[in-house]
């Protein structure tokens, strides 16, 4: 238990450290005091070196206390001596006091202090270097002497009683060893025993007693000549134009020959013989000549020489030819600024901005400058150079956080000229927090990805099968009992359907051929249909017209298997239908002018009514009848017919015409006028002899009165009973009463066996085809038609509905086996 408690405490304590480690933000590093120095024993300064800032802004504070006091004071001045320093003026300086000094670094997380530094002002005195060092040679008694003179440090107070001790060192210019000469408190020194004809380098330093030596002064050089001689030839070092409007030339003097020497610059212009002297020796510094705008010609070549003269003679430099266009070297860019930008949702970058050189006339376009920058880490040695072009700003990306960079910029003219000097160094430090944020994001993403992978692996191990089943569910098998899966896989649909007790698919090639709207035939004298109760003369002019076929494959012609099977067995025959325009004329003409026999059976008190609003879609082609008659419908069973008759209150009598189309049906329209002679009769007989069917036409006169409901017994002939195969195929209709007996219709003592339905015509006419052999053979099977019972509420119905049966002389059929048809479209019932 104790071990668990200890481990928990350790984890809790390590959490802040882990957080600090992940974010790379920590306490500041320990600063270090480098040195403390007093220039004249009256003031002093201390400098320190900062440690790491811990990734956060850090403040540095210097605290001190005196040996005789316990009170702690803060630095009085952080600016005078520069960055990371503290300056103590005379008010805060005591020469006989020891100071205990520490530096504290503080950031948001914490603070850190340097080691204490004990300072006694008398022991840290280090004056500045002497200034104004001059060298001069003098000859005394043919001996050459060197006189060196200087001044005390600049901060030394002349009114003070401090005494400086000086020390001088010199060496030949070609050697490395220095010769040191103590001077004392004097500010000049005379040196002899020098080698004539050699150049020497001289430096001076000083100290206070007690204290430390100052830094050496700057170097001064002098040539010790062996005797009196003219000066050496000077050398022109360079000529430069900063803005392509003025220029300056510099030279390097030679040996002066032991005498003071004067230098003069002379020049002449191309194409002129006149010689001019330098207009200004002071503006550009010593050993130089400045040409202002008045003395500068942009398209002129200058021939320049420098002449050195002393008491012993003179000497001139080599001529130097100058064209201002090619000596342009602008000044370094000014106002260089470095700024670290922190855009939202983007990485930080360093923005560098600068200004063109002050003397360059860039706005007017007289001078166009290109810029180049370089940067490196403070501790690095190699510079990274970037060409910027003519813009005065640049964005630096991909800088390493936590490092301090040095940046410099220079420029040059876009055409002729040279690069300027590099600008002064600019420093900027890139904080660590940007890289830390990126690291945190990647660490979090890595941890989350690892957790997700572990969870998915664990889930797959424990519930792999369920996951696979959920992602890839199994294909379900057939659930119908009795299906042979082998037949289903092999694709034998016919055997599969036969196993299920379903009929095979009907041939698709004949569906359209079985469809026809209606066939109108107008017969004249020899070809006529007789109504049941009226007689008359047929019209002298009749037309035989074949209308356009309805090719709706969804009609009943495609649904009836009997028609399909019969159609496949029949030969090509021309379908025909007869339409009687005048029934009375046909009856009058019947006696001696036509060879066809017509038998009409009158049916009284029996009608079929159909309502347009409640009618269903027929399985036979719906015909648009003339005089805006509604389309007729057919059904496959008495039950459906009973549904129609039991749900309609307003129905009209309609006739259904069923047509047996030819296998190769053609769309054509024939119009013929029958005059009444024997030639027309023979033509009609030949036309009908080409077909294998005899039509029976049933016409029902329409009534304007609304009829009541019909009894279901009216529709009793709805299917085929049997097919005779004795001599020629014959179809017998089946009566669907309870007695189950077969009824045959006879007219004038002749039994009629209906072979098939031919077609459905307009004007409510049903056409059937009888057997030709029965027309000439009497039969004893004639029975009167049974009348169906009428509904007592039924209204008055027209009784002039007739069924006319005609047969051509020669109606040949091919004995093609058992043929039957489904006359489910027989809407009226027969007596």
UniProtKB/Swiss-Prot annotation:
One Gene Ontology molecular-function label: cytokine binding
TM stretches of this protein: 439-459
Biased composition (Polar residues): 777-803
Motif WSXWS motif, chain ranges: 419-423
GO biological process, one term: positive regulation of cell population proliferation
GO cellular component, one term: plasma membrane
Ranges in the topological domain labelled Cytoplasmic: 460-831
Residue ranges of the motif Box 1 motif: 471-479
Places the protein is found: Membrane
Comp. bias regions, Basic and acidic residues: 545-554
SUPFAM superfamilies, A to Z: Fibronectin type III
InterPro entries referenced in this protein's UniProt entry, alphabetically: FN3_dom (IPR003961), FN3_sf (IPR036116), Growth/epo_recpt_lig-bind (IPR015152), Ig-like_fold (IPR013783), Long_hematopoietin_rcpt_CS (IPR003528), Type-I_Cytokine_Rcpt (IPR050379)
Domain observations: The WSXWS motif appears to be necessary for proper protein folding and thereby efficient intracellular transport and cell-surface receptor binding. The box 1 motif is required for JAK interaction and/or activation.
Role: This is a receptor for the anterior pituitary hormone prolactin.
Protein name: Prolactin receptor
Organism: Meleagris gallopavo
């Amino acid at each position: 238990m104790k071990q668990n408690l200890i481990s928990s405490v350790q984890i809790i304590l390590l959490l802040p450290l882990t957080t600090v480690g992940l974010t790379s933000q920590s306490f500041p590093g320990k600063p270090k005091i480098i040195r403390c120095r007093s220039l004249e024993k009256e003031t002093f300064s201390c400098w320190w070196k900062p440690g790491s800032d811990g990734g956060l802004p850090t403040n540095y504070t210097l605290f001190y206390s005196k040996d005789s006091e316990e009170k702690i004071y803060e630095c009085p001045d952080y600016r005078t001596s520069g960055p990371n320093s503290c300056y103590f003026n005379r008010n805060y300086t005591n020469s006989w006091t020891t100071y205990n000094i520490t530096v504290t670094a503080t950031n948001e997380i914490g603070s850190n202090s340097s080691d204490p530094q004990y300072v006694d002002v008398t022991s840290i005195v280090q004056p500045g270097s002497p200034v104004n060092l001059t060298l001069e040679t003098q000859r005394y008694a043919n001996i050459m002497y060197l006189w060196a003179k200087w001044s005390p440090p600049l901060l030394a107070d002349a009114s003070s009683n401090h005494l400086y001790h000086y020390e001088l060192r010199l060496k030949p210019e070609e050697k490395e060893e220095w010769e040191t000469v103590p001077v004392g408190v004097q500010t000049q020194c005379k040196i002899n025993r020098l080698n004539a004809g050699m150049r020497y380098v001289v430096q001076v330093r000083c100290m206070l007693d007690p204290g430390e030596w100052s830094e050496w002064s700057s170097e001064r050089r002098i040539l010790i000549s062996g005797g009196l001689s003219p000066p050496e030839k000077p050398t022109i070092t360079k000529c430069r134009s900063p803005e392509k409007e003025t220029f300056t030339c510099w030279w390097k003097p030679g040996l002066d020959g032991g005498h003071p020497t004067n230098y003069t610059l002379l020049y002449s212009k191309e194409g002129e013989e006149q010689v001019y002297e330098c207009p200004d020796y002071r503006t550009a510094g010593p050993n130089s000549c400045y040409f202002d705008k008045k003395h500068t010609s942009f398209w002129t070549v200058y021939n320049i020489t420098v002449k050195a003269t002393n008491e012993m003679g003179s000497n001139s430099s080599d001529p130097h030819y100058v064209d201002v266009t090619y000596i342009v070297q602008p000044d370094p860019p000014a106002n260089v600024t470095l700024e670290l930008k922190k855009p939202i949702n983007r990485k930080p970058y360093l923005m560098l901005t600068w200004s063109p050189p002050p003397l360059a006339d860039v706005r007017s376009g007289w001078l166009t400058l290109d810029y180049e920058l370089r940067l490196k880490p403070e501790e690095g040695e190699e510079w990274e150079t970037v060409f910027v072009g003519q813009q005065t700003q640049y964005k630096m990306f991909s800088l390493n956080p936590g490092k301090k960079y040095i940046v410099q910029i220079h420029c040059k003219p876009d055409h002729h000229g040279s690069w300027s000097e590099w600008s002064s160094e600019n420093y900027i430090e890139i904080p660590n927090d940007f890289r830390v944020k990126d690291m945190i994001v990647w660490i979090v993403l890595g941890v989350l990805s690892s957790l997700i992978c572990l969870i998915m692996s664990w889930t797959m191990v424990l519930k792999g099968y369920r996951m696979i089943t959920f992602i890839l569910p199994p294909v379900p098998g057939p659930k119908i009992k009795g299906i042979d899966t082998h037949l289903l896989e092999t694709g034998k649909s016919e055997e599969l359907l036969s196993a299920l007790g379903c009929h095979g698919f009907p041939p698709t090639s004949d569906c359209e051929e079985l469809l026809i709207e209606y066939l109108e035939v107008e017969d004249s004298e020899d070809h006529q249909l007789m109504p049941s109760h009226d007689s008359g003369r047929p019209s002298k002019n009749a037309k035989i017209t074949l209308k356009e076929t309805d090719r709706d494959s969804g009609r009943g012609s495609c649904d009836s298997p009997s028609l399909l099977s019969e159609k496949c067995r029949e030969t090509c025959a021309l379908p025909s239908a007869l339409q009687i325009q005048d029934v009375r004329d046909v009856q009058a003409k019947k006696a001696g002018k036509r060879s066809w026999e017509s038998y009409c059976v009158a049916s009284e008190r029996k009608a079929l009514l159909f309502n347009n609003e409640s009618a269903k879609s027929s399985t036979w082609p719906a015909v648009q009848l003339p005089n805006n008659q509604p389309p007729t419908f057919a059904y496959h069973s008495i039950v459906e017919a009973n549904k129609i008759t039991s749900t309609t209150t307003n129905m009209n009598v309609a006739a259904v015409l069923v047509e047996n189309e030819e296998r190769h049906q053609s769309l054509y329209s024939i119009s013929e006028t029958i005059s009444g002679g024997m030639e027309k009769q023979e033509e009609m007989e030949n036309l009908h002899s080409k077909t294998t069917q005899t039509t029976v036409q049933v016409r029902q006169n329409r009534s304007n009165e609304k009829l009541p409901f019909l009894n279901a017994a009216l529709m009793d002939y709805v299917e085929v009973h049997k097919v005779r195969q004795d001599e020629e195929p014959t179809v017998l209709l089946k009566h669907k009463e309870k007695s189950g007996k077969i009824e045959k219709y006879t007219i004038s003592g002749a039994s009629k066996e209906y072979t098939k339905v031919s077609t459905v015509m307009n004007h409510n006419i049903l056409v059937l085809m009888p057997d030709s052999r029965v027309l000439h053979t009497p039969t004893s099977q004639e029975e009167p038609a049974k009348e169906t019972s009428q509904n007592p509420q039924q209204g008055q119905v027209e009784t002039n509905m007739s069924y006319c049966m005609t047969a051509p002389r020669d109606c040949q059929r091919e004995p093609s086996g058992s043929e039957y048809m489904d006359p489910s479209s027989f809407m009226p019932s027969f007596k």
